[in-house]
A protein has these predicted regions:
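Conserved ABC ATPase signature
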Residues: 145-149, 153
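P-loop NTP-binding/switch modules centered on Walker-like glycine-rich loops
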Residues: 179-261
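Conserved catalytic motifs of ABC-family nucleotide-binding domains
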Residues: 166
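Conserved ABC ATPase "signature" region
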Residues: 72, 122-140, 193, 249-250
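Short catalytic/signature loops enriched in Gly
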Residues: 16, 21, 232-332
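Conserved ABC transporter NBD signature motif
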Residues: 64-72
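ABC ATPase NBD coupling module
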Residues: 17-19, 73-89, 107, 115, ...
Length: 332
């Protein structure tokens, strides 16, 4: 049984003056198994961070279900969700903003343990020391305040705080994007080690494809609030079956000379999330699009190996030979 089952998830943000809405998440469905990492990747505005916040009920869903450990948490009140809070945590993009500047490292990590209400002071202190070691910090950091730490140390504190209650799921929202390259490597290695030791599952949100490839067991690529393509990391990076996936990967320069993704142009404006097209959201930019694409919205269909693609021409994507000079996912 999956740890997390997301079905037809939607999130709209109403615009009061016009009566319209920003359609941020549009019918997203996926599972997360215990101990796995699902990489959620997309450009700015794709809806990936909104999905992450929905998973831990920092936002309320407009429609759909999020079944976590057998319970649909979208139907729970804040009070009813409280027992699940310990099992689903989030690490945020900017560690400085997510840490209270008035709390020491020890107090920041201890906070979730206090909220649990069933650990005495000695047990809390022991758990804090255990967590500091787990995220590869030193006990000398415990009395420090956030401003006395480096960005990498701050993010490690954020990770320790998220792990304090022994969660089954941690949503990582761009956890290394604000860090220096060498620090990123260290934090990623720590996250991998923690997963191996604890069996925690991650939803790893990022715009960085190389990072997603490195850390994820499976990948879901998002475009305009929906999943364009999803599958194992190996399948997605070896051969794409959605035009947006192929364009996204072909726009990335890989340090490995053996990794070559043929050019694939997407030309034109990205549709407004307020007035989404009737058919495929990519039809106005895709060289494979026809009248059927413009009129009928594609479902996320399953293919060999468990891969899924929301494209009417999924089988033709890999074979398409680009003849255009453009090679970018956001050319206008």
């Amino acid at each position: 049984m999956a740890l997390l089952e997301v079905r037809a998830l939607r999130k709209d943000f109403p615009i009061r003056r016009s009566g319209e809405a920003v359609h941020a998440v549009n019918g997203v469905s996926f599972d997360v198994e215990p101990g796995e990492t699902l990489g959620l990747v997309g450009e700015s505005g794709s809806g990936k961070t909104t999905v992450g916040r929905l998973l831990v009920k920092l936002l309320e869903a407009s429609e759909g279900s999020i079944v976590f450990k057998g319970t649909d948490i979208t139907r729970l009140s804040a009070r009813a969700f409280r027992p699940f809070r310990a099992s689903a945590q989030m690490v945020f993009q900017d560690p400085a903003d997510s840490l209270n500047p008035r709390l020491t490292v020890a107090d920041a990590i201890r906070g979730p343990l206090v909220s649990l209400g069933h650990m005495d002071s000695r047990a809390q202190q022991a758990r804090v020391r255990e967590l500091i070691e787990l995220v590869e910090l030193d006990e000398r950091n415990l009395p420090m305040y956030p401003h006395q730490l480096s960005a990498g140390q701050q993010q490690r504190v954020g990770i320790a705080r998220a792990l304090a209650t022994r969660p089954d799921l941690v949503v990582l929202d761009e956890p290394i994007s604000n860090l220096d390259p060498m620090v990123r490597v260290g934090v990623l290695n720590t996250l991998r080690d923690i997963q191996e030791q604890t069996g925690v599952a991650y939803v790893f949100i990022s715009h960085d494809l190389s990072t997603i490839e490195e850390v994820s067991h499976r990948v879901a690529i998002m475009y305009l609030g929906e999943i364009a393509e999803m599958g194992t990391t190996e399948l997605i990076f070896a051969r794409q079956m959605h035009p947006y996936s192929r364009a996204l990967l072909s726009s990335v320069l890989y340090p490995d000379p053996d990794v070559v993704v043929p050019r694939f142009p997407l030309v034109g404006e990205i549709p407004s999330p307020i007035n989404l097209p009737r058919g495929c959201f990519l039809a106005g930019r895709c060289p494979l699009a026809d009248e059927h694409c413009r009129m009928v919205h594609p479902d996320l269909r399953e293919f060999e190996g468990g891969r899924r693609s929301a494209c009417h021409h999924a089988e033709d994507v890999a074979a398409f030979k680009a003849t255009h000079a453009e090679n970018t996912v956001d050319s206008h």
